């Protein structure tokens, strides 16, 4: 009998970069959605952003993340499941390897597990904060509401 969906996700979270474990837990056609489905500008900053497929995508995406950031803390605060759906919530602290900027962000992960295999994963975080950990210089002029004065960030 395969492990329960929550057990599968727990094992994956403990072995994110272990090819043997990832290949045994992730279905060959699994979908990995990181932050959004497609955003060309964000993808330039964080190449793993968007949609990719298969166990190698899980390994490549997380491998790319951890070459750019030092994982200083990753804490799961809540994890629960309903049928094949597993929800994971928590927060992390990363330090950018390029600039040494530290960012803290909440995260959420939706995982679907069928027959003991991850078939879908969607990861969300504070993309503005994490992307800003790579911001060397520059600013934006932003206008958030019609008729209001633009401001610089």
Predicted feature locations:
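Short acidic-aromatic low-complexity motifs
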Residues: 2-34
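Short, mixed-charge, low-aromatic patches
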Residues: 13-22, 45-48, 65-69, 89
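Alpha-helix initiation/capping motif
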Residues: 1-2, 47, 51, 100
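Residues that form generic nucleotide/phosphate-binding pockets
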Residues: 12, 25, 61, 65, ...
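A solvent-exposed, acidic/Ser-Thr-rich amphipathic alpha-helical stretch
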Residues: 28-84
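A beta-strand edge to alpha-helix "cap/lid" segment located at domain peripheries
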Residues: 66-153
